[in-house]
């Protein structure tokens, strides 16, 4: 894995860098072979009482992301790594369940699940949470700009809002971030 460690309001010391690489490097044991992925780690230090660690590992068939707030930076790194490990194990369980259901490795390879991000089989499989859809809504997407979409989202009291961007005529999503600001998701066409 290639590590990109960035600090905001904190100097990334060699000890901090070693801790990140050592902890996140342990995740490689879940993969059959060496993972060629860029690990993006943002370390943010707000004050004496709060630090934040964001870890993103984009891979071909899986994107891992973890965000943790904690008083201690090292503890936050440990907790973020634990979250990533749970995500990997959950994905591994899903792949293994599909493998058992289909009954043959040929099916997995034919359907693209035998790619370079296969998760190594281990005995300690966690049960996957239920992914039942409990409500479904249908509505027409009104063309609008992102500011109007944010106003609509706030008026409805939602954390996100799907709309058709009037400028690009593509479906976009605005969402409220944890820091109170807003984000926009756009397709790449």
Curated annotation (Swiss-Prot):
CDD domains: RaiA. Disruption phenotype: The expression of a sigL-dependent gene (levD) is up-regulated two-fold in cells lacking yvyD, but the relative amount of the sigL transcript is not increased. In cells overexpressing ppGpp synthase YwaC, deletion of this gene causes loss of 100S ribosome formation by dimerizing 70S ribosomes. The keyword Cytoplasm applies. Keywords: Cytoplasm, Stress response, Translation regulation. One of its GO terms (molecular function) is ribosomal small subunit binding. GO terms for biological process: negative regulation of translational elongation. Induction: Expressed under the dual control of sigma-B and sigma-H factors. The sigma-B-dependent promoter drives expression of yvyD under stress conditions and after glucose starvation, whereas a sigma-H-dependent promoter is responsible for yvyD transcription following amino acid depletion. Also claimed to be under sole control of sigma-H. It is found in: Cytoplasm. One of its GO terms (cellular component) is cytosolic small ribosomal subunit. SUPFAM superfamilies: Ribosome binding protein Y (YfiA homologue). Its main location: cytoplasm. InterPro entries: HPF/YfiA_ribosome-assoc, HPF_long/plastid, RHF-like, RHF/RaiA, Ribosom_S30AE_C, Ribosom_S30AE_C_sf. Required for dimerization of active 70S ribosomes into 100S ribosomes in stationary phase; 100S ribosomes are translationally inactive and sometimes present during exponential growth. May not be the only factor implicated. Might negatively regulate the activity of the sigma-54 factor (SigL). PANTHER family: 30S RIBOSOMAL PROTEIN. Interacts with 100S ribosomes. Not associated with 70S ribosome monomers, about 1 monomer per ribosome. HAMAP family: HPF. Belongs to the HPF/YfiA ribosome-associated protein family. Long HPF subfamily. This is Ribosome hibernation promotion factor.
